Amino acid sequence: MVGRTPEYLGKKIQAREVKLVAIGTLYMPVVVLIAAGLAIATPDGRKSIYDSGPQGFSETLYAYTSQTNNNGSAFAGYTGFLQPNAPGNQGAEGVTFADLMGGLAMLLGRFIPMLAALAVAGSLAAKRPAPAGPGTFRTDSPIFLVLLVGVIVIVAALSFLPALALGPIVQGLTHQLF
């Protein structure tokens, strides 16, 4: 960075904190996209997906997003266990893959961002507070709120918009349900 060191609550934010926040922020989308990609790209993973086309992709993406965020819900068409006798379905063979990948997504999605947040908190707690100066960016101002919401929306859009373009957006534009 060029210029002044940023501050938050009177504590200087340095490169270590920025890296930890980046890990905590980007970790969830990376786990979701890798898990959904493996489910779609591998034969065992495809057995877990009942619906084809954009609906099947949306179900897979939603399942891993939910599991990585520790909710664990899924659309009814995800995992072969839910529709064992449906035409073209391989029965319950894909359940093991879906269960193992879902459990791994939950495990990774829960602890890595938590550890990153705790590391940032510990790093900031160890620092001495700096006195507020004339250039201090106040956290109780409307501009802080606008910038915070803007960054959240931009990071979320950049993380999932390409994947959403393959699923729900295509489904909505083509009116193709299955």
Q: Model segments located where?
A:
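Alpha-helical transmembrane segments
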Residues: M1-Q14, A119-T139
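Alpha-helical transmembrane segments and their helix-start/interface "positive-inside/aromatic belt" motifs
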Residues: I13-M28, T139-V151
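Hydrophobic core segments of alpha-helical transmembrane domains in multi-pass membrane transport
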Residues: T25-L38, L118-G122, L147-F160
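Hydrophobic alpha-helical segments of multi-pass membrane transport proteins
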Residues: M28-A36, Q55-S66, L107-A126
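Membrane-helix cytosolic exit motif
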Residues: L38-T42, P113-A126, A157-T174
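P-loop potassium selectivity filter motif centered on the GYG triad
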Residues: R46-A105, A163-F178
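Internal helix-turn-beta structural module
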Residues: A74-G77, F81-P87, G91, R128-L161
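Hydrophobic alpha-helical transmembrane segments of multi-pass membrane proteins
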Residues: M101-L108, I154-A157
